[in-house]
């Protein structure tokens, strides 16, 4: 508050839209046990599931923060930076990595954004005067700085 106006940009992913972890839908698992969020992770760690959950948590954080600081000059929003040409694929499990490597090698140049392009939405949320002028808080943005509906679970 002392340095207001302030911005909080929570970087998420389109994986935040995956319903696994919220509803016990058979193809997506058994859902999150909110009394012990680590219960299923201890028995069977699934990186994709945990990544999606963490990205949904980023959206929930920005939304909750925006509500808590409503009326103050603090602007909290979240965004998906887009498919960016980074080294994220190095963390993909071995059984999927061959397919992923093949995809990225063949389509990287035209399907993925450069890191500079991928940073544009975050830079917009962190620096654009429009955020304050239009009182934009608790919103979800997609590349390139397009406001869209957040995941329905957020």
Segments (PLM) and residue ranges:
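Rossmann-fold NAD(P)H-dependent dehydrogenase/reductase core
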Residues: 1-97
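Short, intrinsically disordered, charge-balanced linker/junction segments flanking boundaries
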Residues: 20, 149-154
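C-terminal helical subdomain
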Residues: 54, 102-151
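Short, Lys/Arg-enriched charge-dense amphipathic segments
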Residues: 89, 96-104, 154
């Amino acid at each position: 508050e002392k340095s207001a106006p302030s911005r909080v940009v929570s970087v998420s992913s389109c994986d935040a839209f995956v319903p696994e972890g919220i509803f016990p839908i058979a193809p997506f698992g058994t859902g999150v046990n909110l009394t012990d969020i680590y219960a299923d992770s201890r028995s069977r760690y699934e990186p994709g599931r945990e990544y999606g959950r963490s990205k949904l948590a980023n959206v929930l954080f920005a939304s909750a923060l925006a509500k808590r600081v409503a009326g103050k000059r603090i602007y909290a929003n979240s965004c998906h930076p887009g498919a960016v040409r980074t080294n994220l694929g190095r963390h993909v499990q071995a059984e999927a990595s061959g397919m992923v490597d093949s995809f990225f090698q063949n389509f990287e140049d035209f399907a993925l954004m450069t890191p500079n392009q991928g940073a544009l939405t975050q830079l917009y949320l962190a620096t654009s005067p429009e955020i304050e002028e239009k009182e934009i808080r608790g919103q979800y943005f997609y590349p390139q700085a397009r406001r869209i509906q957040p995941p329905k679970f957020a």
